[in-house]
């Protein structure tokens, strides 16, 4: 694969990139599901993994798409092949990022346990997902069928995430909402309806 990703500038104004990248500065970071479906993301201005690489002191990626992982390794990315529900890198990280991943999983408990095994006392975990209460999804569901991605196993909300993670000793410390569509930001709606995605930061309880 020949693709000079540096030709495409990173979209630092993107709300998801801002939320994640600001927490990566000088940190050791593990990025789960970093391929983001296909190699088309490689040169995309909103590819989270590339933004993290620009800010982190050290970055390791993990994804179950073996061919894509091999291609990205050839382009200088430190990515390993693995499953987000059953990985063991035998080390800890300052920050673990799971961007738009949790809605694809089979077993959330196994995923959280794997994350916990790679966290130290001051580590943080970032989880992002689509917002099921986004105004556009509600409108579409009202007049047509509910918009879904057929690879998704659930709709997750920050409240549900907090309840789930609390059972494993994690607490939510911050939640923000954002959209890739700029016009959403100007709508006179509560943020939980206005934006298409949510981003959460968690830490170990206690």
Give names to the regions the model predicted.
Residues 65:
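Conserved SAM/SAH-binding beta-strand->alpha-helix loop
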Residues 85-96:
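A short acidic, Gly/Pro-enriched loop at the edge of an enzyme's catalytic core
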Residues 75-86:
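Conserved SAM-binding strand-loop segment of SAM-dependent methyltransferases
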Residues 2-14, 42, 85, 106-206:
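S-adenosyl-L-methionine-dependent methyltransferase catalytic module, highlighting the catalytic core
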Residues 72:
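Conserved SAM-binding loop
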Residues 95-106:
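A short SAM/SAH-binding and catalytic strip from SAM-dependent methyltransferases
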Residues 52, 57-60:
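Short beta-strand element of Class I
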Residues 27-44:
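Conserved class I S-adenosyl-L-methionine
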């Amino acid at each position: 694969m020949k693709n000079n990703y540096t030709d495409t500038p990173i979209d630092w104004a993107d709300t998801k990139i801002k939320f994640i990248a600001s927490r990566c500065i000088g940190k050791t970071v593990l990025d789960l599901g970093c391929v983001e479906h296909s190699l088309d993301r490689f040169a995309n201005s909103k590819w989270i993994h590339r933004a993290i690489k620009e800010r982190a002191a050290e970055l390791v990626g993990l994804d179950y798409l073996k061919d894509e992982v091999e291609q990205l390794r050839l382009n200088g990315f430190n990515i390993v092949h693995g499953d987000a529900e059953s990985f063991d890198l035998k080390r800890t990280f300052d920050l673990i990022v799971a961007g738009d991943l949790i809605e694809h999983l089979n077993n959330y408990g196994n995923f959280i346990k794997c994350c916990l095994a790679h966290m130290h006392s001051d580590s943080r975990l970032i989880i992002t997902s689509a917002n099921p209460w986004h105004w556009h999804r509600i409108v579409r569901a009202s007049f047509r069928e509910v918009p879904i991605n057929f690879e998704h196993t659930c709709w997750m909300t920050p409240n549900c995430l907090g309840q789930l993670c609390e059972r494993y000793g994690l607490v939510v410390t911050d939640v923000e909402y954002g959209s890739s569509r700029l016009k959403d930001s100007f709508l006179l709606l509560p943020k939980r309806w206005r934006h298409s995605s949510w981003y959460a930061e968690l830490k170990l309880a206690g």
